Amino acid sequence: MERNNILPLVLLVARPAAGKSEIIEYLANRIEDSVRSKDYHIGQINVIDDFPFLWRWFEEDDLLERMGKDRLFTDQNGYFKDTAYWDLLIQLINLEYDKSLKDSDIESGYTTILEFSRGKQHGGYRRAFSLLSDAILENLAIMYVDVPWEESLRKNRERFNPQHPESILEHSLPDEKME
């Protein structure tokens, strides 16, 4: 497949625990490069996922609390103190994408996959999409993974590994955050 047939940027959209990270894992590590490019128009993969940013905030807040300081981002129940932090996560995705464009390793033949999930209570996808940079929107393809809520909830409960709650593939949300 010619490099110009490779999608430069794909946003993977779905509910939490709908399989977004598993799709990325499959595309990146389970099939040959030639199959991925020919069948899916996906090149070498660069992933920008907001979960590592989010998890880092939880860790930083826990550390601050242990130091006797106020938590910055989240309350003790894991909810953001300010809904603006959902917007900040999108701005961090924009920033990481801009930085990746400067990376000489990320060139034609690469596909950047953006991954995040949003609920209605803080603006949903409409709000998140409105904050994506022009650099992203100019090249964006969107792949929606349609998974029933019940299946997403089941997978969310099953995938949790208490030994690795920071894991992209093994973290979960409390049921009330899934609604």
PLM features: residue spans?
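Glycine-rich phosphate-binding loop of ATP-dependent small-molecule kinases
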Residues: 1-179
